[in-house]
Each structure stands twice: as C-alpha cells, then as structure tokens.
Amino acid sequence: MKEHFNNKSLKSLKIAYVGDSNNISNSFALAVKVLDLNIFFCCPDEYNKSLKKINKDFKKLKISNNIMKSTKDVDVIYTDVWTSMGMEKENRKRLKAFKNFQISKDIINNANKKVIFMHCLPAHIGEEVTEEVLNSENSIIYKQAENKLYTAMALIDYILSS
C-alpha cells in the first residue's frame, strides 16, 4: 500500500477489508491497534466472531455487514477467500452467507475514484471477486504477490545471517 500511494502515511488511507474473519482480518485488526489504521471490516454477522473478540477490549474496530457502507469512498479494498483451507466442508454454507459480499465493479465504483484492489491469492473468481475486478486497472494483486517474494527472501536472509 505504501509503495502504491507513494509512501503516503497509512493512517491517512481508508481501507475496507471485506470477507471472512480469519488470519488476514485478524492481522489487520492488530494493525489498527498498533498503527492506528482506518479500516472498515465487512462480513456477515455470523462470521465476525474473532473480530468482535479482539474489539471487546480494544473498541476501535469498525465492523459492519453492509458492503456499500464499508466501501464508500475507501482508498483500498482488500478481500480473501470465503472458505479457508481446512473449512472445505463449510463451503456451500459460506457461499450462501457471503454471496452479497463479492467485490464487483459496483463495489469498486462505490469507492474512491483511484481505489486499489488487493487479494492475498489464490482468488476464487466468481466468488469473493469478479474476473473484471481481478484483472482491472484497480487491481494490484500481481505487485502484491511479487512483494511477498521479496519479504520472504528478506526474512530467510535475516534468519540465516543471525
């Protein structure tokens, strides 16, 4: 994000995380705590338990089940798969619960004019995101994936040289 927004302060960005309350959303929630970020979390009520648990003591997380409200004028929209590894038995139930949380062109158009779309990949096209958005000029998923490589390389170098 910092790279895309020319090192603009992350605190000044409005970010929407749309999807399951999982490792990605929990990391974002901790980032809110540590970095004082402005993140809107959006998912069906029955899938926000870990976020509510984090928010119980913290009380700064913005949690909603309204995707249009959560993505209004945001600078970044981030999503993840609706069914994480190990939860495949819940797939049908999750597809039904999350069907109104898909990132489509309508959601992109609801955001800031220069919104970027992010996804940790692999994406399930037609579920959490449309192909149109995934391959749009708003999408920075390939740059995001490339940066993961450099992060992993730096961590390996740090560990091996310690």
Descriptions of predicted regions:
Residues 1-162:
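Structural/interface elements that position substrates and couple domains in central-metabolism enzymes
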